[in-house]
């Protein structure tokens, strides 16, 4: 779940998983050549430990294994002039009888927040989830103190189903809740 969210509006696009273009960046499926740029986004977000439940010392190899998804999931990027500004990933939230519900995560490089990138990544993933036949999307662990992300996901139709109290140990403010958020597709 994104937690490096932004709140700026993004131009409307068709409901398709094809590459989407905004006034200033494109969102498209990631390629192997995008990995260095994806890692440049992931690493600082993970190291701060404020918005994702990953270990702060996650290695590049571990991150790649966890972030890069296979169909029906996918990994995607927001790019401008060949520079990866942000990235997202989409996958089934559970296996078996729960595999019809999607889960996604998003990260935006700190230098590019406030440009509508997280909104565009989320919109892309919602379209991709619909196209892949998912019936809903669930975010399992939106950090309660990440109010920008919480606001953004709510503005995009997600609702908070529950909050697990003190489930996240924020490195600066201590224990905070994790929201479970949901949207029917």
Task: Name what the model sees in each region.
Residues 13-16, 29-32, 55-111, 122-124, ...:
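Acetyl-CoA-dependent GNAT
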Residues 114-129, 151-155:
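Conserved acetyl-CoA-binding loop-helix of GNAT-fold acetyltransferases
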Residues 2-23, 106-107, 164, 170-185:
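Terminal substrate-recognition subdomain of acyl/acetyltransferases
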Residues 113, 139-149, 167-169:
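Conserved beta-strand-loop-alpha-helix junction that forms the acyl-donor binding cleft
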Residues 40-57:
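Helix-loop element at the rim of GNAT/NAT acetyltransferase active sites that forms part
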Residues 154-164:
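Conserved acetyl-CoA-binding loop of GNAT-fold acetyltransferases
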Residues 129-142:
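Conserved GNAT acetyl-CoA-binding A-motif
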Residues 26-38:
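A short beta-loop-alpha structural element at the N-terminal edge
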């Amino acid at each position: 779940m994104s937690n490096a969210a932004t709140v700026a509006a993004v131009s409307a696009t068709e409901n398709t998983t094809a590459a989407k273009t905004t006034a200033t960046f494109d969102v498209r499926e990631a390629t192997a050549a995008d990995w260095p740029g994806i890692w440049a986004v992931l690493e600082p977000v993970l190291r701060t430990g404020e918005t994702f439940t990953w270990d702060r010392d996650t290695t590049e190899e571990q991150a790649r294994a966890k972030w890069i998804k296979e169909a029906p999931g996918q990994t995607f990027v927001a790019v401008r002039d060949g520079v990866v500004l942000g990235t997202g990933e989409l996958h089934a939230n559970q296996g078996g009888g729960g595999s019809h519900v999607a889960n996604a995560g998003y990260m935006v490089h700190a230098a590019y927040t406030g440009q509508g990138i997280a909104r565009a990544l989320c919109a892309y993933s919602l379209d991709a989830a619909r196209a892949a036949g998912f019936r809903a999307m669930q975010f399992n662990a939106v950090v309660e103190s990440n109010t920008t992300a919480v606001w953004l996901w709510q503005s995009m139709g997600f609702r908070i189903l529950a909050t697990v109290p003190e489930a996240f140990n924020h490195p600066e403010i201590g224990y905070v809740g994790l929201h479970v958020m949901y949207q029917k597709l």
